[in-house]
């Protein structure tokens, strides 16, 4: 039970739904609240479908392209590093709200890469490859984290009114620090295993 809770929390942090709230608020601000809820639900379902495909066929896909998991870990960690830096240096949310968008987003950029990014995919494939936890536990933890992320995003308009711009900015930067640490850990893990250096522990 503790393992499931820890994995669920890890995946929830990797989904970074609180940090994604400013993006959703900016892209969906011109729609009614009911329309926003429908779009968020649809995009989260798209993201879940993509994750299930990666969990089911991810290893075969990378083997077909002759891509090692360690390379994906290193590159995924680097991409996550750049994302975390942008999150920590994020401008005030109202700057992102200046751009008026009347086009309804479909899959990109909300489902991917905002909800389902390289961090989540890399973590899922890594845990599947390592075999430390069963596929059932990993899959269940992913579903739990996804459900909490969906709930968080559905409440985005409420969080926007409650915390305001400064609260959203502080939350985004806090998750940026957490993702930065995870990105370094992910790169160290990939480098350590790929080159058999042995400095990574955990």
From Swiss-Prot:
Main location: membrane
Membrane topology of the entry: Multi-pass membrane protein
Keywords in alphabetical order: Cell membrane, Membrane, Transmembrane, Transmembrane helix
Transmembrane helix listed as a keyword: yes
Keyword Membrane among record annotations: yes
GO cellular component, one term: plasma membrane
Transmembrane spans: 7-27, 39-59, 61-81, 105-125, 137-157, 175-195
Subcellular location: Cell membrane
InterPro entries associated with the record: Multi_antbiot-R_MarC (IPR002771)
Family of the protein in this entry: Belongs to the UPF0056 (MarC) family.
Designated name of the protein: UPF0056 membrane protein CPn_1010/CP_0843/CPj1010/CpB1048
Source organism of this protein record: Chlamydia pneumoniae
Lineage: Bacteria, Pseudomonadati, Chlamydiota, Chlamydiia, Chlamydiales
